[in-house]
């Protein structure tokens, strides 16, 4: 029986009883019947809505909370992309804190990573395959006071391509932490100067990449994760 039929039957019953009822007793009977009719109609309407919107009834396709079906094309595509990216070359090397006075990269410390063909040779990362790569590096300089001569800090990422065997700067930055000399009578205050660089480049198999600075004596090794160099195949 449909919801419309149920409502119509209730209305007919009210009309019949209204004609038969009379006096106070009849009024009370009509009031009870009206209340019962309202509850019946409300229940039928609620049941119809639950069935219509699929809250009850046949189970829907399994879904992840707040997301698409686990068998949807979108999820399958993301899974395939994740599996493919796990086979791409990647490297993340950190500064060797046991080599004062020079910037030496190391791939054996904690949080360092070399995967899928990337090599560290002669302080350079060797690209294992053609493709687009994200190249990034950060250094942190630290000093105490400012000298009488200008102080310039440089950070350069260079590429030696297999096709022309010439060292070319592909990312470069320069900073000066000191704008004036610290007076002899003044307290020499510490300063910190970070430099971060990153970019996407088309590289060839066998290309060599280096990250260098001009004043390694100012490098800050106080905390891990402050000086690093890496590449990620895209």
From Swiss-Prot:
Glycans are attached at residue 81. The record marks 34-35, 39-40, 49-52, 77-78 as: Cleavage. The soluble form derives from the membrane form by proteolytic processing. The membrane-bound form is further proteolytically processed by SPPL2A or SPPL2B through regulated intramembrane proteolysis producing TNF intracellular domains (ICD1 and ICD2) released in the cytosol and TNF C-domain 1 and C-domain 2 secreted into the extracellular space. The membrane form, but not the soluble form, is phosphorylated on serine residues. Dephosphorylation of the membrane form occurs by binding to soluble TNFRSF1A/TNFR1. A lipid is attached at residue 20 (N6-myristoyl lysine). GO terms for biological process: extrinsic apoptotic signaling pathway via death domain receptors; immune response; necroptotic signaling pathway; negative regulation of feeding behavior; negative regulation of lactation; negative regulation of protein-containing complex disassembly; positive regulation of apoptotic process; positive regulation of canonical NF-kappaB signal transduction. It is a single-pass type II membrane protein. It is found in: Cell membrane. Homotrimer. Interacts with SPPL2B. Belongs to the tumor necrosis factor family. This is Tumor necrosis factor. It comes from Bos taurus (Bovine).
